[in-house]
């Protein structure tokens, strides 16, 4: 009741309702692993949150190459597939989302980035366009929404699967303005969800 999400609430009313749905994990990486593969995280080798690695041993942890994602299945059946946003399932190129069925990837590999500079907790740029690290200007939430709209527009005449993994409301808690201002308790992600929903209706 405290945080208003009228647009997400509307999507829930108008969409499919799951009455018995469980998350396989309580934190990011294992949950994403389960969502994408349909398997328990222990079976896919991701039992904890992946932090930005600083030694070689930690770099090897990530989604294993034999895992099959829903993106791979859909891509094999004629769908265009894209991930726009957060990956958080491994940092090496062998863990890259484009090796797991996503034909397009724009976003970041780590758990969170600065919303303005797109740098990770160590100050390194973590913004990818395909297989290339390539920073883009813009506030992360707005940028991911705009990129998603562009993808929908480009693929409106063919079957596609767009997995939008927004950064919001993950830390760091940063708004789109330079100054921190007090606003009505409405999630930034709610506004962007509505923007995408309205955009889909147009097309």
Language model: regions and residue ranges:
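Formylglycine-dependent sulfatase
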Residues: 1-203
